[in-house]
């Protein structure tokens, strides 16, 4: 598969048949120069509703017809309530549930994080934040989404050997780099990419320092917008 990291928590994954976007916050993301109109996914995975994760999802989904996969309550808001999501289609799954496509599947896990967005003039809870386990080409990628450190991350590794973990390190709104090191140990991932850092003043972190504290060869810091093979 081919993976591109756009900064914050935004990724593109290309399988043999399918293009997947994860949390495509692109407009307003200082790390990327990618134009959302140049991306043509079949699926968009959303860990939660916050704007720095939902990002450009609705515009991309309307233009391409991509299916949005997210937690079931947020999916219902997208399909039935949110005016900015008009013309989009979301498939909802809940914790423990799996969505399967031709050449990948995604299973939903809990994350310790809040989840709300503006609906009209009100800030409304729209489901709950999640982590996601993607199985692609017999490899498992675990995306923590936004989360605090919590011990149930150990259960992911108990059920699935994790080939690649995407772990938030920025602090303030999520766990910081020190807690992320513990999360990486809980997940026992063969490789780790740090995420959710240095996009805003409140989430400053040093990804190189984080990677240097992982076991040798585990940490990966991709260049923003540059595709790599995994």
Swiss-Prot record:
What terms describe the molecular function in GO for this protein?
Answer: hydrolase activity
User: Record's InterPro entries?
Assistant: Metallo-B-lactamas, RibonucZ/Hydroxyglut_hydro, UPF0173, UPF0173_UPF0282_UlaG_hydrolase
This protein is called UPF0173 metal-dependent hydrolase OEOE_1287
Its keywords, alphabetically, are: Hydrolase
**What is the superkingdom listed in this entry's lineage?**
Bacteria
Q: Per the record, a Pfam family?
A: Lactamase_B_2
Protein's organism: Oenococcus oeni (strain ATCC BAA-331 / PSU-1)
CDD domains per the UniProt record, alphabetical:
metallo-hydrolase-like_MBL-fold
**The keyword Hydrolase is assigned to this record:** yes
**Claim: Hydrolase is one of the keywords in the record:** yes
Q: Which family does it belong to?
A: Belongs to the UPF0173 family.
Task: Give the stretches traversing the membrane.
Answer: none
């Amino acid at each position: 598969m081919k993976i591109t990291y756009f900064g914050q928590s935004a990724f593109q994954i290309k399988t043999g048949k399918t293009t997947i976007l994860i949390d495509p916050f692109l407009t307003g993301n200082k790390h990327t120069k990618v134009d959302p109109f140049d991306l043509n996914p079949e699926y968009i995975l959303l860990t939660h509703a916050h704007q720095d994760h939902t990002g450009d999802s609705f515009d991309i989904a309307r233009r391409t017809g991509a299916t949005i996969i997210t937690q079931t309550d947020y999916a219902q808001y997208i399909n039935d309530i949110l005016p900015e999501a008009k013309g989009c289609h979301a498939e909802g799954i809940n914790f423990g549930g799996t969505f399967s496509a031709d050449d990948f599947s995604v299973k939903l896990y809990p994350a310790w994080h809040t989840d709300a967005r503006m609906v009209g003039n009100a800030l409304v809870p729209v489901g709950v934040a999640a982590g996601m386990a993607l199985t692609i080409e017999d490899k498992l990628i675990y995306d923590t989404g936004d989360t605090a450190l919590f011990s149930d991350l150990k259960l992911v590794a108990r059920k699935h050997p994790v080939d690649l973990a995407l772990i938030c390190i920025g602090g303030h709104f999520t766990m910081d780099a020190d807690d992320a090191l513990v999360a990486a140990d809980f997940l026992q991932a063969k490789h780790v990419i740090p995420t959710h850092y240095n996009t805003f003043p409140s989430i400053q972190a040093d990804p190189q320092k984080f990677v240097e504290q992982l076991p040798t060869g585990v940490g990966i810091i991709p260049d923003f917008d540059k595709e790599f093979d995994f």
